[in-house]
Amino acid sequence: MIKLKDISFTYENSREGESQLRHVDLRVEKGELVILAGRSGCGKTTLTRVLNGLCPQFYPGKLTGGYLLDGQDALKMPVHQLGTMVGSVFQDPRSQFFTTNTTDEIVLGMENIPLEQSVMQQRVKAVCSQMNIQRLLDRRIFPLSSGEKQLIAIASICAMEPKIIVMDEPSANLDSDAMVRLGVLLYRLKEAGHTILLSEHHFHYVCASFDRLIFMENGEISSIYSRNEALSLTEAQLAAMGLRPFQPSSFQVGGAFLSKPEDIFQVSQISCMLDGRQILEDVTFSAQSGKILSIAGPNGAGKSTLCRAITGLYRSMGTVRIDGEYLKRKQRAKKSFFVQQDADYQLYAPTVVDEFLIGKKESPELRQAALARLCEMGLEPFADRHPASLSGGQKQRLLLALAAESGRNLLVFDEPTSGLDGYNLRLTVKLLRHLASMGKSLLLITHDMDLIAEAADCVLYLEQGKLRYHRNVLRDK
């Protein structure tokens, strides 16, 4: 079905000798589900872009080697022909939307095939039922949460039923239930004969259905494991490879979190409406200095909206106090640092190191501090690179470093580890713990059970815009 022979690719304007893919040989048969694994920046996303034709037709660069798709030379195919054979779900779902309505978006690809209206209606009903997203039909796309957008992107591609489906971290922003449903959907597609390539850091939701795991390092395929071989790898072996365990960490919550008058951060009766919908309703909680609060809940529960409201990015009802002082919206924005889910919104400078110098008077000491922070997050080799050239996981780590260097006492992170491998997850946990030890108050919006288990002191759970519980995390001493 797919045959890559000696594929190498170098992006335009890359440094001399710097290739993103090096001599990749890979054969994938019809009906296989293959995981592409490896540390952030190892070349997984670039490989998916070669498979769907975006490299070099959309991302300019030098591509060498051979690529056969169903026996045809894919490198000579018109992009529209390749697009009918290979369906893609990108790392950032926003980059593949063409409409503003969810139902229109799911239908659009089928209209371009084209399919009969009755067939399209049947497929929309089937895929939305399998993914449990009927509630998202006929909604405006822009107000949706990142996880809900990801679900729409997945549904739009799966409804087309292409021969080959290439997904780049499709579970990054999904809650645990949605991940399970995605795993079931991929299993059904695989059983129906579709070929699936999955670039992922989270493996548990496809444990029962994947056939092989392709491990990449520095743009090369380092190892290929059968399903049994991959599942036999110990946690220590996976950690040495920079990968996460095949099963997510578990944790227990204890009694209710008890607020204290001296809590550094106090939120009272926050309510918010967006696009005519009640997103938050009377949310009240507090956080302590030196503690890490995880904000959890299903996709669309209002987690990101809550954090945008309390950091002053959204208008809302209710009050927020920091260090005992009531703060208006603009004051809250100055007192806090909010790391958004979409890293591109917060990166403006021409180089990575220059991100630390925005709005500051440059000095050797400031530059040295920035380089030290980059080194801490494994980003020092990219100091002079443009931020847009980084991988998704590298951009996330850059924003974590910027938050750490901001000097703010309230740090809020929206899915800070969604695109991170096991190695960089551990780096992130170490940094978060260090920031907490300095007396800062940290809020983490996350679906990542590994992050909650390793870093969180307490969990605040939202559902349908309401606070369901706020409890301490029980951890073995």
Sequence positions of predicted segments:
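ABC ATPase NBD Q-loop/coupling interface
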Residues: 66-81, 319-332
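Conserved ABC ATPase signature
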Residues: 140-144, 148, 386-390, 394
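ABC-family nucleotide-binding domains
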Residues: 175, 421
